Amino acid sequence: MNEIKTADNAKTYCGFIAIVGRPNVGKSTLLNKILGQKISITSRKAQTTRHRIVGIHTDGPYQAVYVDTPGLHIEEKRAINRLMNRAASSAIGDVDLIIFVVDGTHWNEDDEMVLNKLRAAKAPVVLAINKIDNIKNKEEMLPFITELTSKFDFAHVVPISAQGGKNIAELEKIVRESLHEGTHHFPEEYVTDRSQRFMASEIIREKLMRFTGDELPYSVTVEIEQFKLNERGTYEINGLILVEREGQKKMVIGNKGQKIKQIGIEARADMERLFDNKVHLELWVKVKSGWADDERALRSLGYMDE
């Protein structure tokens, strides 16, 4: 990767930070809060993030490159689950700092599995105890913190609210202190290394998660078939939603097409905010049986590029 040289000879600092944890503890929400905008999709469903998302936060001489990973989990029956675990595990290897995000309200066997993987990590680990806004009596956290710090030698322990922003500044201060002197890897205006095409597919997938609730399992993905700027300066985006069964297709389309229409309206609005440009979005739904267990299909959909 080409490094970015500054105009003067002022010292600059850069480093890589992995955000890890089990599914649905708020990793993507934390990254979005740090960056000040949404680049990593969120929903109440676990395992919303399927790819390693790189978020870039440049503040004067400091550039922190964050890797938001899929949630690590024990279940590995399907090819897509194995690939997500592989992506999350590989992110731990070559970073300057690891932020281990846990839910302050409970701990489970997936948390324990992540913690065991961190024992092999060379980088210092910060324990970020999230969702503290859901804990009325903060003294109740003390036994939880004591138990976790007895399990692992954390460099820092920071109770946070990724949603509300509580103690995020303190966490960012720890991140800055972990950065090494060196030239920045990305231009100052970059907030992610992902393409607009990729971000469009993620936005559509987020809306699918939100509008189908628990009706639709995780055997759904989005392929962008067209992404172009037309002569009027509008992005023309065609998204193909892949599901595994005919019944799932009906769920996505909804009664008289109302659900897919709402998904399209919300996705287009998010794209226009992110791309700062007018967007014309068209969506289709197609049944592709067994795609989540087919490594060739996963490769073509971008799940094996990491």
Curated annotation (Swiss-Prot):
Pfam family membership, one: MMR_HSR1
Region annotation G1: where it falls in the sequence: 21-28
UniProt-recorded name of the protein: GTPase Era
Residue numbers spanned by region G2: 47-51
Annotated region (G3), positions in chain: 68-71
Gene3D superfamilies: 3.30.300.20, P-loop containing nucleotide triphosphate hydrolases
Origin: domain of life: Bacteria
Renumbered residue ranges of the record's region G4: 130-133
Membrane topology summary: Peripheral membrane protein
InterPro entries with a match to the protein in the record: G_ERA_dom (IPR030388), GTP-bd (IPR006073), GTPase_Era-like (IPR005662), KH_dom-like_a/b (IPR015946), KH_dom_type_2 (IPR004044), KH_sf_prok-type (IPR009019), P-loop_NTPase (IPR027417), Small_GTP-bd (IPR005225)
Presence of the UniProt keyword Cell inner membrane in the record: yes
Region of interest: G5: 160-162
Keyword annotations from UniProtKB, A to Z: Cell inner membrane, Cell membrane, Cytoplasm, GTP-binding, Membrane, Nucleotide-binding, Ribosome biogenesis, RNA-binding, rRNA-binding
PROSITE patterns: G_ERA, KH_TYPE_2
Domain Era-type G: 13-181
Localization annotation: Cytoplasm; Cell inner membrane
Gene this chain is encoded by: era
Species this chain originates from: Pasteurella multocida (strain Pm70)
Molecular function via GO: GTP binding; GTPase activity; ribosomal small subunit binding; small ribosomal subunit rRNA binding
Annotated family: Belongs to the TRAFAC class TrmE-Era-EngA-EngB-Septin-like GTPase superfamily. Era GTPase family.
Domain KH type-2, chain residue ranges per copy: 212-289
Assigned GO CC terms: cytosol; plasma membrane
Binding positions for GTP per the UniProt entry: 21-28, 68-72, 130-133
